[in-house]
């Protein structure tokens, strides 16, 4: 069992088992067993809303006991809470599978995390580059040159 805190400072326990997998299937029409194929993990990492929906379904019994609706849960999920919750879900999902599949899923998850870190580093490097600054400045100059070139006459402006 993995835990995370939402932005309302509530602690949630994520437990992936047959019951929670069936609940996610029933409520969201998402089969967590498809994690083995890899596409589901990519979707869970790439779409911050999807893991929140899945986690709510996984934690639904706890949410119902606390009187927390799907909407209230969603309002308490943003930023780091989503990342922590997604990590808890993915780790629990990996641990659900038997040893052979679990090893493959751990490798796939590690690859995706490495790829994500590399992507962030490349984007950060690009944003810090003087070349980007020069390109943006050149585009701004083009806009400045073209904006003063054609002025509408006051006759073409409708009077209210």
Where are the predicted features?
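Broad gene-expression machinery/nucleic-acid interaction feature
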Residues: 1, 11-13
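N-terminal pre-domain segments used for targeting or regulation
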Residues: 21-22
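Charged interaction scaffolds used for protein-protein
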Residues: 1-3, 26, 30-49, 61-160
């Amino acid at each position: 069992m993995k835990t995370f805190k939402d932005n309302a400072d509530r602690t949630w326990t994520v437990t992936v088992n047959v019951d929670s997998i069936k609940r996610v299937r029933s409520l969201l029409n998402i089969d967590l067993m498809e994690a083995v194929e890899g596409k589901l993990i990519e979707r869970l990492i790439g779409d911050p809303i999807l893991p929140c929906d899945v986690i709510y379904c996984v934690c639904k019994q706890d949410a119902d006991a606390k009187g927390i609706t799907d909407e209230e849960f969603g309002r308490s999920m943003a930023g780091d809470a989503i990342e922590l919750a997604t990590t808890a879900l993915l780790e629990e999902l990996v641990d659900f599978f038997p040893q052979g599949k679990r090893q493959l899923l751990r490798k796939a998850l590690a690859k995706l995390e490495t790829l994500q870190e590399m992507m962030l580093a490349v984007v950060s490097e690009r944003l810090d580059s003087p070349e980007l600054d020069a390109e943006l400045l050149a585009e701004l100059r083009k806009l400045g040159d073209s904006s003063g070139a054609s002025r509408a006459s006051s006759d073409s402006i409708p009077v209210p």
